């Protein structure tokens, strides 16, 4: 009863409830018994309608903490006869995402004075194959005319954001870190964790682009191999960083 009522508060306009949701009140009680620290991370590997996220945000709003949550859920398809399917949600994951949005908004609306700094943002990821092409061929199997086909080792359907988050995982950078986009020398650049990592995956990257990034003195700088405007830029790449930011760790995809 309390579970459906709690979810109903968030989905009251949808005309139906999620089947068998966990009650927010129960999750909050369990989290309290766990004696969580103010910056702890809560994991839920059967997240369903994202009640755990709702409970964590509610607790943060009450005591000013900054706990985070990681939710994992298989993309189970909703019953076509259900109310949530009729409302446009195709998987349980989509329901959970909308639940988090609405719950966060509702918490802020109910306590505007005490939730000004409450972080209700979240990111959604899915398990996928590598962004990199499978280019393992024996020399005897490759003809000279085919070499241009292997100039770019990144799959054509992958976005700059896909590459960025793969790099963050490879470097052990928290996926909840701040990510800012800006233009440097006419190229889109990602600045992660206030410049700890700076990445540029655009095409036609010039010496000036590399120099502008090096002058920011990031701990990590990442570029796309095929993104360099010409061989000269690739040849000068290391020297530019040695001149302006020798301590920066450089990586090329």
Name what the model sees in each region.
Residues 1-11:
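Single conserved hydrophobic/aromatic residue that forms the stacking wall/gate
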Residues 7, 65-68, 120-122:
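Short glycine-/polar-rich loops that comprise or flank the Walker A/P-loop
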Residues 140, 160-162, 169-253:
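Conserved NTP phosphate-binding and transfer environment spanning the P-loop NTPase/kinase superfamily
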Residues 84-167, 172-176, 181-184, 188-190:
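SAM-dependent methyltransferase catalytic region
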Residues 19-26:
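N-terminal pre-P-loop "Q-motif" helix
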Residues 27-106:
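Conserved S-adenosyl-L-methionine
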Residues 45-47, 56, 71-76, 126-128, ...:
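Active-site proximal loops enriched in glycine and acidic residues that flank catalytic Cys/His/Asp
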Residues 12-18:
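Class I SAM-dependent methyltransferase Rossmann-like catalytic core
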